[in-house]
């Protein structure tokens, strides 16, 4: 039961960090390459 409580307290923190990093990365890509329907590095 203690492991479940630890998991339930760690998972929201990790997912918040992950989505924050992902959102920041997408914002920076859109700032560097505005209106890119396909990315110029392909």
From Swiss-Prot:
Keywords from the named record: Chloroplast, Membrane, Photosynthesis, Photosystem I, Plastid, Thylakoid, Transmembrane, Transmembrane helix
Intracellular or extracellular location(s): Plastid, Chloroplast thylakoid membrane
Gene3D superfamilies noted in UniProt: Single helix bin
Record has Manganese as a keyword: no
Record-level GO cellular component terms: chloroplast thylakoid membrane; photosystem I
Transmembrane segments: 7-27
InterPro entries: PSI_PsaJ (IPR002615), PSI_PsaJ_sf (IPR036062)
Alphabetized SUPFAM superfamilies for the sequence: Subunit IX of photosystem I reaction centre, PsaJ
Topology relative to the membrane: Single-pass membrane protein
Biological processes per GO annotation: photosynthesis
Role according to the record: May help in the organization of the PsaE and PsaF subunits.
Family from the record: Belongs to the PsaJ family.
Name of protein: Photosystem I reaction center subunit IX
């Amino acid at each position: 039961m203690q492991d479940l409580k630890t998991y339930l307290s760690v998972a929201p923190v990790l997912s918040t960090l992950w989505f924050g990093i992902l959102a920041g990365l997408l914002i920076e890509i859109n700032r560097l390459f505005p209106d890119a329907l396909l990315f110029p590095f392909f």
